[in-house]
Amino acid sequence: MTALKLPSLPFALEPAGSPPPGCRVRSGVMTLTAAARTDMFVDPAGTGPVPDAGRFVGLPPAGDFTLAAQVSVEFASMYDAGVLLLHAAERDWAKLCFEYSPQLKPTAVTVVTRGTSDDCNSFEVDGSTLWLRITRSGAAWAFHASTDGAWWRLLRYFTLGLELVRVGFLAQSPAGAGCAATFDHVTFRPGAPENLRDGS
């Protein structure tokens, strides 16, 4: 599978992981289709293999930035999700997810993996669309979500402890037969909000 170039991104997106997701790009809108039983989660209980779901990631320019997208997911099975991803190494990465919870509710979820993964469910969403945003601010990362693309709720503020971090997109279906996630209104902006906690 070849690299992707979205008009709004100043870097190419390279395929990684296995099996590769299905991918369609039309007018700057990207749809990824996850294969069955695909995930990225390193269970802190130490059970199961280290998953390596197919994804598209690229190396952003140096400095602070925000990467945002309106994410729509065709939910069918629990844990189906569309994801904005940070990836530094096999066991050093983080996910900002719009995910189907075990209660079958669309939910904003974050996962930070440094050796093993944590798992943090944030808030439920009415509908199948949510705005997600990644921010790099110095050595730190921030995950935000928004129901309207205007007011942003801070979900996580953390570091991966590594300088070389790729960013990108993922669809997952850990418990299901596959999942399609669409990423619309993808934007990349240099700089970070002055205040990560005031909704801007």
Predicted regions: what is each one?
Residues M1-S200:
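Extracellular glycan-recognition regions
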